[in-house]
Amino acid sequence: MSRRTTAKKRLAVPDPIYNSRLVSMLTVRILQQGKKHLAQRIIYQALDIIKERTGEDALNILETAVRKVTPLVEVKARRIGGSTYQVPMEVRAFRGTNLALRWITKYSKERSGKSMAMKLANEIMDAVNETGNSVRKREEVHKMAEANKAFAHYRF
């Protein structure tokens, strides 16, 4: 084992336009091949599309979407006596937000459509309306945790 001290958790630097850590975390999720400017442009275009459609503040809508996709519990594999159990665990706030952003970007990439900004905007709007694949994924994770509630006492 390493004798070094554990590395300090670095918080995401807020993005330049909205001054939001959530937008910068989403930028990192969309980022491909180090093209951060392109990732930021996609997100800003998606937020503009959302603002045009709803007439409300796009950042508030993004925060609502992330809140509705964030899981409260998840299952983790735990090996006990030769068999593996799916043990339900509470999700910490930062991990929950990260999972929500991961699912939103994953399912927006899988959508059919022309531009990534449009696909991302549609996925965010669907998340706010509690439809779409990212919300379905959250429900799936919650169902798995509910089904394996009997193994909750194996929590570590």
Curated annotation (Swiss-Prot):
Keywords: Chloroplast, Plastid, Ribonucleoprotein, Ribosomal protein, RNA-binding, rRNA-binding. The keyword Chloroplast applies. It comes from Rhodomonas salina. Belongs to the universal ribosomal protein uS7 family. InterPro entries: Ribosomal_uS7, Ribosomal_uS7_bac/org-type, Ribosomal_uS7_CS, Ribosomal_uS7_dom, Ribosomal_uS7_dom_sf. The keyword Metal-binding does not apply. Part of the 30S ribosomal subunit. GO terms for molecular function: rRNA binding; structural constituent of ribosome. This is Small ribosomal subunit protein uS7c. Pfam families: Ribosomal_S7. One of the primary rRNA binding proteins, it binds directly to 16S rRNA where it nucleates assembly of the head domain of the 30S subunit. One of its GO terms (biological process) is translation. GO terms for cellular component: chloroplast; small ribosomal subunit. It is found in: Plastid, Chloroplast. SUPFAM superfamilies: Ribosomal protein S7.
